[in-house]
């Protein structure tokens, strides 16, 4: 029997708002998904087309996240590791090995061999699949934020610290979904730029 190797990746470490997402995917060698690549190299339309194929054909997959509150309490690195652990723990099928994009392996509870692979999202199919699921889930959250908080432009900048996003925070105030531990948000709070309750 083939070893069940789980790929793990995250999305949303750099934004000023929203959760950080992680996905874990065990691909089925009998049902390959063509066109997998690092989610950052794919168009949004291509990611949206691949995500349901991954979910349908994978042996197992799980998307998990850490909240804004957890990010602010733990820091972004530890919150990312927490989201990755939750994603692996949520798999319906236990993996035989875990491969994580990047240079750190989270403290998985499972006693399973795990290794970090730098640029794994571009070289390991299961990690590419995980990067696509994490990114599409994160993008979906940003569309929800855009609908809930008009004027901030979440659909366009996806929460990243663009000039337009920082200007919106300065103009409209800090929202409950903003990461208060991140520099630009912290500076706005220091200036008293708290948004009205939504």
Curated annotation (Swiss-Prot):
Catalytic activity: Endonucleolytic cleavage to 5'-phosphomonoester
A Pfam family per the record: RNase_HII
GO cellular component, one term: cytoplasm
Binding of a divalent metal cation, residues: 9-10, 101
Enzyme Commission code: 3.1.26.4
CDD domains: RNase_HII_bacteria_HII_like
Domain RNase H type-2: 3-194
Gene3D superfamilies, alphabetized: Ribonuclease H-like superfamily/Ribonuclease H (3.30.420.10)
GO molecular function, one term: RNA-DNA hybrid ribonuclease activity
Keywords assigned by UniProt, alphabetized: Cytoplasm, Endonuclease, Hydrolase, Manganese, Metal-binding, Nuclease
InterPro entries from the UniProt entry: RNase_HII, RNase_HII/HIII, RNase_HII/HIII_dom, RNaseH-like_sf, RNaseH_sf
Cofactor binding notes: Manganese or magnesium. Binds 1 divalent metal ion per monomer in the absence of substrate. May bind a second metal ion after substrate binding.
SUPFAM superfamilies on file: Ribonuclease H-like
Necessary cofactors: Mn(2+); Mg(2+)
Localization, UniProt: Cytoplasm
Source domain of life: Bacteria
PROSITE patterns in the record: RNASE_H_2 (PS51975)
GO biological processes: DNA replication, removal of RNA primer; mismatch repair
UniProt entry tagged with the keyword Magnesium: no
Family from the record: Belongs to the RNase HII family.
Function, as annotated: Endonuclease that specifically degrades the RNA of RNA-DNA hybrids.
Protein name as it appears in the record: Ribonuclease HII
Gene: rnhB
